[in-house]
């Protein structure tokens, strides 16, 4: 399968929505979205999933295309693994209405992971016909079907107080990433299905201080991440 077999224009891409920072997230930049002070009310007493936020390129895959968050087809050199090594093997398992979103870790961004077993980690699946984000259990099931990992899960359950949550986050942020070195942050979502209109009250993130955004200088000097067990 070559890149010419990928139809980049046949479907209008559905980009991954921006995620608000928790009110006290230290890594928020001036143009990032931030939650209100009472943001935790949307999550208190509800079943949630907290995942490690990996430092890569947000990428969407359908059964006919793959593209970056900006809706630009993945033609850059650090997306070669998506086009060549992943897309051909998963496209027939994705329905016409589904978009699989994940973190492309082929290129080192600001964190150099040293225990990666895959360059692509799934974190969400959207159904354009039903207009719903799949529940986390369905995302995990979908990942098994595609034989791809999800982003690491830190917690599943109910947290009743913001203090309890922050104690957990502070502990997790003091521990290494599942793939060595430091964590970029965490993402917390309601475990069930999420409608687009409920997005801002259903998912939130916490990002480490001094998080470095990629820019033109990074594009000129990027390097490939190492895998400990490259299955492709």
Positions of predicted regions on the chain:
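Core nucleotide-handling region used for phosphoryl-transfer chemistry
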Residues: 2-232
């Amino acid at each position: 399968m070559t890149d010419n077999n990928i139809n980049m224009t046949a479907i209008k891409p559905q980009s991954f929505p921006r995620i608000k920072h928790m009110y006290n997230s230290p890594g928020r930049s001036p143009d990032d979205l931030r939650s209100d002070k009472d943001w935790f009310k949307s999550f208190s007493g509800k079943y949630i999933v907290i995942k490690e936020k990996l430092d890569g390129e947000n990428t969407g895959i359908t059964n006919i295309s793959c593209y970056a968050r900006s809706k630009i087809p993945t033609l850059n050199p650090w997306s070669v693994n998506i086009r060549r090594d992943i897309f051909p093997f998963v496209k027939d398992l994705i329905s016409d209405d589904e978009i699989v979103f994940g973190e492309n870790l082929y290129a080192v961004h600001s964190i150099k992971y040293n225990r990666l077993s895959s360059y692509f980690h799934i974190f969400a699946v959207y159904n354009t016909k039903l207009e719903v984000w799949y529940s986390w259990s369905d995302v995990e099931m979908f990942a098994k079907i595609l034989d791809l990992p999800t982003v690491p899960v830190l917690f599943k359950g109910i947290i009743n107080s913001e203090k309890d949550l922050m104690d957990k986050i502070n502990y997790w942020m003091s521990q290494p990433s599942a793939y060595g070195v430091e964590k970029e942050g965490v993402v917390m979502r309601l475990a069930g299905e999420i409608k687009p209109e409920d997005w801002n009250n259903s998912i939130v993130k916490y990002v480490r201080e001094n998080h470095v955004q990629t820019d033109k200088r990074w594009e000129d000097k990027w390097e490939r991440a190492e895998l400990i067990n490259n299955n492709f």
